[in-house]
UniProtKB/Swiss-Prot annotation:
GO MF assignments: 1-deoxy-D-xylulose-5-phosphate synthase activity; magnesium ion binding; thiamine pyrophosphate binding
Gene3D superfamilies: 3.40.50.920, 3.40.50.970
Protein name listed in UniProt: 1-deoxy-D-xylulose-5-phosphate synthase
Cofactor(s) in the UniProt record: Mg(2+); thiamine diphosphate
One GO process term, biological-process aspect: isopentenyl diphosphate biosynthetic process, methylerythritol 4-phosphate pathway
Underlying gene: dxs
Co-factor binding details: Binds 1 Mg(2+) ion per subunit. Binds 1 thiamine pyrophosphate per subunit.
C-alpha cells in the first residue's frame, strides 16, 4: 500500500540523500512540509511510531543535506524518530510495511540499509557507538564524520554521560545533536539565539576560542579566573555549562524546525575539531495538532483517521496484564503505605497511570535508568519499605548486575513485576522478552513465577509482595488476559505446581500463559497437564512423580529454550538419575523478528497446532 508520490512533488525529487543534496536550499521548507504530510498519511494507514518522527523532520533533512551519508555516519538513538530518515534513504515506498511481518524494521537496522550504521531499539547507546566510529574514522584518515542524534530523555541515562565523559577525554571529531522536545520553542530560542549559534559554530569564533585556550593555558595566575569568567558570560546566553565541563563545545539552543537555519549551523559545525554538541529545540508531533497536544498517546499509533484527530478506542473486553498489575498496585497501596512502586520511564506501558495519580508519594519514575531503578529499590528495602519494580523484560537486561549485586546477594525483598515477557510482536528483535527466565533462574535466592492467567497473576503479585526472604519476580506477557474470574488475594505455596488435567503416558509441564494452547493439546493427546507456576524453586516432588508415572515429558514456555524453565527440569532429572525423554518447547536459538504476536507464535510453532505438531513429530522419532 504505497501512496501516490505525485501528491508530494518535492519529496518525489528526493528518493535518496544524493538527490536531496542536489535540491536548492530554498526548496527545503517545502520538502519538510511534504515529508511531514507523507509520514502522517502513511502511518495513519498502517500504524507505527508517529509523534517522534513528526518532530525530527527538519533535523533529518538538514543532516542528510549537509553530511555525505552514508559515507558520513549518522547514528540515531532508540530510533522511534527515524521514520523520516527511512523515507529519505530509499525506503519511501515501503514505509507502510514498517513493524509488520517481513516489512521494514521498526528501528534503524544495519541489515536493512547502508544508511543505518547502528541497529538500535534500546535507548542511550548512540554516543558510545558513535565515539567508537569516530575513533575508527580518525585512524582511517578519510575525513569521515560521525553524528549522533539523541533525545532529552535518552541523554539522562548513565551510559550517555559515560560516553560523553570519555569523549571529552580523548577529544574525537564528532557531533552530538541533542533533540530536546521537553520545552516548546519559546522566546529565548528565536532569531537572536539562532544567530548566536551560527556565530559560535563559525570558524572565526572556533579559531579564537581554541587559540585563546592555548594562550591562557600558559598564564597560570589568571587561568582559573578567566575560565570562571568565560563560564559566567557564556552561561548568560547558553545553558551548556554541563556539556562544556564534559569536554564538548556547546552550541544552542536553536530552533529545530528552522531547516535553513539548521543547515547553516551544521555546515559550520561539520569541520570543527573535537567533540561538539548542538542543542536543538523541537516539538513532538509537530505539524499535526492532535499529536502536538497529546504526544504520549500519539507516540505509537494504530491505524487512525487523521481528519478526525482521534485514535480508535480499544474494544474493551478483557483487561491487559499491565492493567491487572496497575489495579493490584492501587488495591495494595490502599492498605499498605509501605509499598513503593518504581518505573524506568514506562508509566503508561506498565499500567501505572492511575497509581501515579492516586499515590504520588509512593510512585517513582526514575527516567531511563534501569540500573538506578533496581539499586534504588534495594535502598528502599533496606529502609524498611516494600519496593515493586515495574519493568519490561527486555529492559531488565540492562540492570542485571544490580539485580545480582545489589538485591539478590543481600537477600532484599524487592519484587519485580516483569511486563512484556515472551513474544511482544511488532517491535522485533530488540524488544522480545526472550531471556529473562534464563538469566534470572541462575541467581541464588530468586523466586520466579509465571502466571497462566490474570487471576494467577494477581495471586503471584500478592505472593511475591509478601515474600521477605529475598527477591521475587512475576513475569507476564504483553496483551490481554483470558477472562479468568478474579479471586480473593492469597499467598500461593512457594514452589508448588497444580495438575490441571490427568492423562496417560505424556505429561505437559506448562510455564506461563501458553496454558490454554497446552490444554487443547493435552485434550487431543490425552496428556496430563500441569501448570507449574514456579520456575524457581521448581516443584521437584511433582516433576519426579510425573517422570515416574509417564513415558515422556514436555516442557512449554515462551522463553529461550537455552537456560529456561525446561532446562531446569532437565537438570533436576539428570541430577536424580531419572532417565525419561523430555521435549523442551520454547523460543529457538535466534533473535525473533517482528510480526504480530499471533504470526510469530504460529511461525515458531507455539500456537496449539504448532505445539501438537512438535510433540507428534518428536514422539514419532
Amino acid at each position: 500500500m504505497s501512496l501516490d508520490i505525485a501528491k508530494y512533488p518535492t519529496l518525489a525529487l528526493a528518493e535518496n540523500p544524493d538527490e536531496l543534496r542536489s535540491l536548492p536550499k530554498e526548496s527545503l521548507p517545502k520538502l519538510c512540509d511534504e515529508l511531514r504530510q507523507y509520514l502522517l498519511d502513511s502511518v495513519s494507514r498502517s500504524s507505527g511510531h508517529f509523534a517522534s518522527g513528526l518532530g525530527t523532520v527538519e533535523l533529518t533533512v538538514a543532516l542528510h543535506y549537509v553530511y555525505q551519508t552514508p559515507f558520513d555516519h549518522l547514528v540515531w538513538d532508540v530510533g522511534h524518530q527515524a521514520y523520516p530518515h527511512k523515507i529519505l534513504t530509499g525506503r519511501r515506498d515501503k514505509i507502510a510495511t514498517i513493524r509488520q511481518k517481513n516489512g521494514l524494521h521498526p528501528f534503524p537496522w544495519r541489515a536493512e540499509s547502508e544508511y543505518d550504521v547502528l541497529s538500535v531499539g534500546h535507548s542511550s547507546t548512540s554516543i558510545s557507538a558513535g565515539l567508537g566510529m569516530a575513533v575508527a574514522a580518525a585512524r582511517e584518515g578519510k575525513n569521515r564524520r560521525t553524528v549522533c542524534v539523541i533525545g532529552d530523555g535518552a541523554i539522562t541515562a548513565g551510559m550517555a554521560f559515560e560516553a560523553m565523559n570519555h569523549a571529552g577525554d580523548i577529544d574525537p571529531d564528532m557531533l552530538v545533536v541533542l533533540n530536546d522536545n521537553e520545552m516548546s520553542i519559546s522566546e529565548n530560542v528565536g532569531a537572536l539565539n539562532n544567530h548566536l549559534a551560527q556565530l559560535l559554530s563559525g570558524k572565526l569564533y572556533s579559531t579564537l576560542r581554541e587559540g585563546g585556550k592555548k594562550v591562557l593555558s600558559g598564564l597560570p595566575p589568571i587561568k582559573e579566573l578567566v575560565k570562571r569568567t568565560e563560564e559566567h558570560l557564556k552561561g548568560m546566553v547558553v545553558p551548556g555549562t554541563l556539556f562544556e565541563e564534559l569536554g564538548f563545545n556547546y552550541i544552542g539552543p536553536v530552533d529545530g524546525h528552522d531547516v535553513q537555519g539548521l543547515v547553516a549551523t551544521l555546515k559550520n559545525m561539520r569541520d570543527l575539531k573535537g567533540p561538539q554538541l548542538l542543542h536543538i529545540m523541537t516539538k513532538k508531533g509537530r505539524g499535526y495538532a492532535p499529536a502536538e497536544k497529546d504526544p504520549i498517546s500519539f507516540h505509537a499509533v494504530p491505524k487512525f483517521d487523521p481528519a478526525s484527530g482521534t485514535l480508535p478506542k480499544s474494544a474493551g473486553g478483557l483487561p491487559t496484564y499491565s492493567k491487572v498489575f496497575g489495579d493490584w498496585l492501587c488495591e495494595t497501596a490502599a492498605k499498605d503505605s509501605s509499598l513503593m512502586a518504581i518505573t524506568p520511564a514506562m508509566r503508561e506501558g506498565s499500567g501505572m497511570v492511575q497509581f501515579s495519580r492516586d499515590y504520588p508519594q509512593q510512585y517513582f519514575d526514575v527516567a531511563i535508568a534501569e540500573q538506578h531503578a533496581v539499586t534504588f529499590a534495594a535502598g528502599l528495602a533496606i529502609g524498611g519499605y516494600k519496593p515493586v519494580v515495574a519493568i519490561y523484560s527486555t529492559f531488565l537486561q540492562r540492570a542485571y548486575d544490580q539485580l545480582i549485586h545489589d538485591v539478590a546477594i543481600q537477600k532484599l525483598p524487592v519484587m519485580f513485576a516483569i511486563d512484556r515477557g515472551g513474544i511482544v510482536g511488532a517491535d522485533g528483535q530488540t524488544h522480545q522478552g526472550a531471556f529473562d527466565l534464563s538469566f534470572m533462574r541462575c541467581i541464588p535466592t530468586m523466586v520466579i513465577m509465571t502466571p497462566s492467567d490474570e487471576n494467577e497473576c494477581r495471586q503471584m503479585l500478592y505472593t511475591g509482595y509478601h515474600y521477605n526472604e529475598g527477591p521475587s519476580a512475576v513475569r507476564y506477557p504483553r496483551g490481554n488476559g483470558t477472562g479468568a474470574p478474579l479471586e480473593p488475594l492469597n499467598s500461593l505455596p512457594i514452589g508448588k505446581g497444580v495438575v490441571r488435567r490427568e492423562g496417560e503416558k505424556l505429561a505437559i509441564l506448562n510455564f506461563g500463559t501458553l496454558l490454554p494452547e497446552a490444554a487443547q493439546v493435552a485434550e487431543t493427546l490425552n496428556a496430563t497437564l500441569v501448570d507449574m507456576r514456579f520456575v524457581k524453586p521448581l516443584d521437584e516432588q511433582l516433576i519426579l512423580e510425573l517422570a515416574a508415572s509417564h513415558d515422556a515429558l514436555v516442557t512449554l514456555e515462551e522463553n529461550a529454550i537455552m537456560g529456561g524453565a525446561g532446562s531446569g527440569v532437565n537438570e533436576l532429572l539428570m541430577a536424580r538419575r531419572r532417565v525419561v525423554p523430555v521435549l523442551n518447547i520454547g523460543l529457538p536459538d535466534f533473535f525473533v523478528s517482528q510480526g504480530s504476536q499471533e504470526e510469530v507464535r504460529s511461525d515458531l510453532g507455539l500456537d496449539a497446532a504448532g505445539i501438537q505438531r512438535q510433540i507428534e513429530v518428536w514422539l514419532a522419532q
